[in-house]
C-alpha cells in the first residue's frame, strides 16, 4: 500500500524562500526611512527636553534672585552646560555647540544648537542665561 505524500516538495520550498526574499527586499527601503525618522524624532525630543530643563532652571533662578542654589538654580553661562541640567546628562552621540550666554542677558532667551554626531542633523532649543 503506497504511503500518502507528506510535507513540501523542493520546488514549493524554493518558491516560499524566493517570495520571502522578495518581500524582505521590498521592505528594506521602508525600514531605512523609518530609522531616519526615528533619529530625527529623538533629536527633536532631546532638544525639547534641553529647552524645558533650561526653562525650569531659569524659574528656579528667579526664585533665588539669580543666586546659585543646588537643586534649584545652576549658573548657565554657555549653551554647552545644558547637560548638567538633564537628569542623565546629555546622551552619547549628541553635543551642544558652545555659545556664550552673557550674564547681562539674564532674563532674555536665546537659541542654542543641539547636534546629532552620527547624522550631522541639528535642532535648536531656547536657553536662558542665569546666575550673577
Give residue spans per PLM region:
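Membrane-proximal N-terminal amphipathic helix
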Residues: 37-64
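N-terminal single-pass transmembrane signal-anchor helix
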Residues: 1-35
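Amphipathic alpha-helical interface surfaces
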Residues: 27, 39-42, 46, 78, ...
Amino acid at each position: 500500500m503506497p504511503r500518502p505524500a507528506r510535507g513540501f516538495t523542493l520546488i514549493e520550498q524554493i518558491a516560499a524562500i524566493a517570495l520571502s526574499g522578495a518581500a524582505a527586499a521590498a521592505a528594506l527601503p521602508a525600514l531605512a526611512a523609518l530609522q531616519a525618522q526615528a533619529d530625527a524624532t529623538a533629536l527633536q525630543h532631546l532638544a525639547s527636553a534641553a529647552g524645558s530643563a533650561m526653562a525650569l532652571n531659569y524659574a528656579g533662578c528667579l526664585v533665588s534672585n539669580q543666586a546659585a542654589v543646588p537643586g534649584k538654580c545652576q549658573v548657565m553661562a554657555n549653551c554647552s552646560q545644558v547637560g548638567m541640567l538633564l537628569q542623565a546628562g546629555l546622551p552619547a552621540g549628541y553635543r551642544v555647540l558652545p555659545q556664550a550666554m552673557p550674564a547681562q542677558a539674564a532674563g532674555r532667551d536665546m537659541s542654542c544648537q543641539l547636534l546629532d554626531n552620527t547624522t550631522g542633523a541639528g535642532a535648536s532649543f531656547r536657553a536662558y542665561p542665569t546666575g550673577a
